Amino acid sequence: IESTVDHGIKSMEEDPKRSMRRLCDLGRQFSKSRCQDYLFGIIQELLENEDSSYYDLVANALKNTDHGTIRDFGVAFGYTSWTYGARMLRSFEKRTGHAAPLTLMLRFQPDLAGGLSISDIDNIIQQGTAIGIFSYFIREVGGSSDSYEIINLFRKYPDCGFAYFRSSGRLTAAQIQ
């Protein structure tokens, strides 16, 4: 999977618009659920506009982001979460009769009494991955004094995809590495 994604990233650098449309077409062709088909259909509609800001977004990401990071993130979301994790979740739902989400959205509030701490988020991720949840959107609330802590937690789960929204400021180069 990784080598295929690496090839796709290289193709995107050469012709981002064509590559994005092609990847979306392939995604829709191989989608295995109504939800995946619907999602790829929406993306196809957005990409029909030659002036879509999504083309600029992807070109910017390719220019300014390590390609290994893009690959790892794409595999975590696109394969581990949406394919492998979705299969695990369907099995969990059949076995227990309880529905579970494909993605969890969490509020990281370490400085707030009763807010989610690193330990809380770690426990949630452990429980989530056990049933098939491999993608997490984490929003920092209240300005954490130490972003290194949460980033190290992300590194503990290399099969997961994380989108981290800080309350203010940017990550430092050291935090990104």
Which residues are covered by each model-predicted region?
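Long terminal accessory regions outside catalytic cores
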Residues: 1-50
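Glutamate identity and glutamate-enriched acidic tracts
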Residues: 2, 13-14, 45-48, 93, ...
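Generic serine detector
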Residues: 3, 11, 19, 31-33, ...
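Acidic-enriched, low-complexity/disordered segments with a strong bias for Aspartate over Glutamate
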Residues: 6, 15, 25, 37, ...
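N-terminal [4Fe-4S]-dependent radical SAM core
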Residues: 29-107, 130, 134
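Well-ordered, non-membrane alpha-helical segments in soluble/globular domains
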Residues: 75-82, 86, 117-124, 146-151, ...
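A generic secondary-structure signal
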Residues: 94, 123-131, 152-153
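Core AdoMet radical
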Residues: 103-119, 128-145, 157-177
